[in-house]
Each structure stands twice: as C-alpha cells, then as structure tokens.
From Swiss-Prot:
SUPFAM superfamilies: Dehydroquinate synthase-like (SSF56796). It catalyses: 7-phospho-2-dehydro-3-deoxy-D-arabino-heptonate = 3-dehydroquinate + phosphate. GO terms for cellular component: cytoplasm. Its EC number is 4.2.3.4. Zn(2+) binds at E185, H246, H262. It is found in: Cytoplasm. NAD(+) binds at G106, V107, I108, G109, D110, T130, S131, K143, K152. GO terms for biological process: amino acid biosynthetic process; aromatic amino acid family biosynthetic process; chorismate biosynthetic process. Binds 1 divalent metal cation per subunit. Can use either Co(2+) or Zn(2+). This is 3-dehydroquinate synthase. Catalyzes the conversion of 3-deoxy-D-arabino-heptulosonate 7-phosphate (DAHP) to dehydroquinate (DHQ). It comes from Leuconostoc mesenteroides subsp. mesenteroides (strain ATCC 8293 / DSM 20343 / BCRC 11652 / CCM 1803 / JCM 6124 / NCDO 523 / NBRC 100496 / NCIMB 8023 / NCTC 12954 / NRRL B-1118 / 37Y).
Length: 354
C-alpha cells in the first residue's frame, strides 16, 4: 500500500492507494473515526456493486449507517438533490459529531462533499473513490461543488476529507469508456508534472495497459496533485495549473448535453488549447502531437465541432475562471513547466479561429 499525506495549514489527511482496501474498509475508517452515524452516499451504478458490502463492513465495527443512493449522472449534482439528502440526514437525527462517506466517482464525491460541508455548517467527510477520474483527480484536494443550470461547479467550497481511500480493484467493474475518461486526467497531470511521468504515459498504448498499470498511474498522479494542493489549497496560484484543458473542456461538455463524459471533453480541450498556443508560439512545437498520441492511443476524442460556435464563447463568458473579462488559461512552456496565459474574453474568437 502507498500512503500520500496531504498536509495543509488547517488539516492533514492521508490518501491510501492499494488493491485490497475494499476488504478492510471498516478497519481503515474506524482508525480515523470513532463510532457515529454515517451517511453512506452512492449512486445507482455503484450502489448495486458495493453499497451493501461497504455498509456491512462499517456496521461490523460499530458505525450506524444510513444508506443513500441517487441516480447516476450529472443531474444528481445539484442543490436540490443536496437538499433532499440533508433533509434525510436531519430526519435520521444526524448531529455535528456524525459523518458523510462518498462511495463513488466524481459526481458522488462532489455531492457528498457539498452535503458534508453544509450539514450543520460542516461535519466529517471521507472519500472512497471508485472511478479513475475520482481516484486520480477529484477526490484529492477538497474541491466540492454542484452545478446550477448550464454552469458547472458554480456552487461549492473547499472542504477537505478526513481520509481518501483509493482501491484500484474498483476499476475492474468500470467499462472501458469510463476508465479511459479518467485516463485523460492522468495524461493531463503527467504533462504538468515532469518528463518522467510524461514518458510513462507515453508507454500506455491500450486500455489494457491502463488497467495493468492503474496503481502506479494513480500513485504518480495523486502525488503530483497533492504537492500542488499543499502549496496552494484555495487555487490562488499554482493550483490553477490543474485546469489545463478544462476551460475549453467544460464548455464542450455542457454543449454536448451528456453525449461526452467529463474526461472526454477535457481531452478535446487540451488539444484545442495546446494547438492554438503552439500556433502563437507559446507552447513548443510537437507537444500537441505528443498529447494527441497519448489520448488517441486509448480511444479518447480529440476534436469537437462545438469549438468556435457562439454558444461555445457564451460558455467561456460564464466560466468561473472569468475574472473581469479575462480568462486564465493554462499552457506548457515545456513538459513539467506550466504557465498561466491571460486572455481577454473579447479576444477569444480571434484566438480560437486562428
């Protein structure tokens, strides 16, 4: 087992990475939490696979479990669903001494974090990440948010967990598409981190390779993200680098109305922004091709007809990274050296179209 400690000014917690954690959840969680009520939150995809066994393990070590299941998908990542969950917890008599465990992927992690942060102004929170996206990215660092209308992640807060459990065995029940979606975030992280990690993703030539190397990929991605979060918890500086590909990606994801997964949209966003930065001499020639080869090797999409449309630019205007008409976009001077490039919203059509 690998343990990566996230040591922040206000909190310290471990991210544990292994392939047998699912067999000792009660042991791991009871080492961090005393006996209490737990709201065990999952979705309709993960629930049938893991909810009953997880609840059983937790009850065996003395926890009182409220099982909560929501429909799978982005539609559950809303204030209305969060409110319904909070109401159920209140009806069950939850107090400030109780906790929330998110058992699932990125949507459940976000939703669970929001619920934990809001209930009685904040109760304890643990992540059990079951998707590659959640394991390597969204479960680490404390970002929690829900969507409002057509704006992603607009309502939320930074709310760190007490523990983050990453068991790559959960990935065995993911479809190839679900797994590959998360791999887009791994490629992103490898480009931001260092040449050694980037070379490693260059060796991944198939979905089978992702599955075979999942634990090492997760460990490297989490180690990099943890280092960034420890240096900049609230995204005032270097944590913005983790948004590489996301400004364009979020717009594309919203315009696709569910036809594209988050990681697929991020893959498209990375190529779209990188190719334009190359054309403007901000990124080195050939780096876009290297990113492209890693993404296409596992079947990720890399182009979208939405880029450059009026609706695309409207979503950029509404992006939460828009500060007074200026977007902070992430580029790479070279692998391992990300930078922020400020672009006026008014200049984006010319930048994108050229």
């Amino acid at each position: 087992m690998s343990t990566i400690t996230v040591d922040l000014a206000t909190k310290k917690y471990d991210v544990k990475i292994d392939n047998t954690l699912h067999t000792r959840l009660g042991q791991e969680i009871s080492a961090v939490w005393s006996a209490r009520k737990i709201s065990l939150l999952t979705d309709s995809n993960v629930g049938p696979l893991y909810l009953k066994d997880t609840a059983k393990q937790l009850r065996e070590v003395g926890f009182d479990i409220l099982e909560l299941e929501v429909p799978a998908g982005e539609s559950s990542k809303s204030l209305s669903v969060a409110g319904e969950l909070i109401a159920k917890m209140a009806a069950a008599g939850f107090t400030r001494g109780d906790g929330v465990i998110a058992l699932g992927g990125g949507v459940i992690g976000d939703l669970g974090g929001v619920v934990a942060s809001l209930y009685m102004r904040g109760i304890a929170f643990i992540q059990i990440a079951t998707s590659l996206t959640a394991q390597v990215d969204s479960s680490v660092g404390g970002k929690t948010a829900v969507n409002l209308g057509n704006t992603k992640n607009i309502a939320g807060s930074f709310y760190q967990p007490d523990l983050d459990l990453v068991d790559v065995t959960y990935l065995n029940t993911l479809t190839d598409r679900d797994l590959v979606e998360g791999y887009a975030e791994v490629v992103k992280t490898s480009a931001l981190a260092n040449q050694d990690f980037f070379d490693f993703t260059g060796q991944i030539k198939s979905v089978a390779d992702i599955r075979h190397h999942a634990q090492e990929l997760s460990k490297r991605a989490i180690a990099y993200k943890a280092s960034v979060v420890m240096a900049d918890e609230k995204e005032a500086g270097d944590r913005q680098f983790l948004n590489f590909g996301h400004t364009f990606g979020h717009a594309i994801e919203l315009l696709a109305h569910g036809e594209l997964r988050h990681g697929e949209a991020v893959a498209i966003g990375m190529i779209a922004i990188s190719s334009r930065f190359e054309q403007h001499g901000i990124m080195p020639r050939g780096l876009t091709t290297e990113l492209l080869s890693r993404l296409e090797a596992v079947g990720l999409p890399t182009h979208s007809h939405f880029i450059g449309t009026t609706d695309f630019f409207n979503h950029l205007i509404n992006d939460k990274k828009n500060h007074d008409g200026i977007l902070n976009l992430v580029a790479l001077e070279k692998v391992g050296q990300p930078i922020i490039v400020k672009k006026k919203i008014a200049d984006m059509p010319a930048f994108v179209e050229n």
